[in-house]
């Protein structure tokens, strides 16, 4: 220990050797290192050394004045020498790792398949991108490919089987990824094209459509339907004329039959004015018992131009809405007479029973 201390010029504040006192100046780095690697000896050892050689060691302390001026060894002594060594190793390993990464990047860029790999990656970026973005990506790919060709012409390409396998596998993965990205986009575009075609099909001028629907309709159908409903005008500007004429020719018969069917349904819902007036006249004459016989229904059908089903439906609805049996007629309904049979007992305001004929009201 004395040799280490003497080498760094470190002893106690005062030392006794052969009865003489020697004073030495403290070396700051020596004090720091001695404090780390050589702590003060225990009291028993100090007593033995004093008895044997007459030399006494005082505990070594850190030179705080040296710490104030930023002595590096003293700063390490204030922390941990092992931590400092570990950090130095980590920094060295990190630098080595970074160097390896840069070397791998350089090998990938200089590989002959790098241009294909880059093109596959940019193709993935182009999926769904606006045209101007896709154009910029194409220009970037061309520029990088030109640079790589120049570099390969100067340096040449080194073969490395593992790197070749990596480049091929990664390129295949990017191609499949682009296909997965493109598939839903293509399906969406196809759907939009179908919708556009259907809209173009519907974009037929209202006038032409009305002419088709009106063909084959009789004057009676138009009166029975209460007049033809005006269709809204549709602007056919920009529609392909050839497609329009083709569709009109193909579906004109179907549209005409559809028009006739709709007219019949409207006719059933609302009877012609003249026919309805004749039925109302009969209703007023037979208000007390508005149940026409079968022969009367046939006569009404002939005079109005309606069928028997329309006649029956009109009288049923009219009785439900506008007629209530009189008190004298209630017993006819309560005794279970059918309205058709009951009409045979009622003639010109008289009701016939077993006792003869008598007048109601």
Curated annotation (Swiss-Prot):
The keyword Ribonucleoprotein does not apply. Belongs to the TALE/KNOX homeobox family. Residues 242-262 form the ELK domain. It comes from the Eukaryota. GO terms for biological process: anther dehiscence; negative regulation of auxin mediated signaling pathway; negative regulation of DNA-templated transcription; regulation of DNA-templated transcription. Transmembrane segments: none annotated. The gene is OSH1. InterPro entries: ELK_dom, HD, Homeobox_CS, Homeodomain-like_sf, KN_HD, KNOX1, KNOX2, TALE_homeobox. Disruption phenotype: Early termination of shoot meristems, reduced leaf formation and reduced seed setting. Residues 263-326 bind DNA. Expressed predominantly in shoot apices. Also found to a lesser extent in glumes. It comes from Oryza sativa subsp. japonica (Rice). One of its GO terms (molecular function) is DNA binding. This is Homeobox protein knotted-1-like 6. The lineage of its organism: Eukaryota, Viridiplantae, Streptophyta, Embryophyta, Tracheophyta. Residues 19-28 have a biased composition (Basic residues).
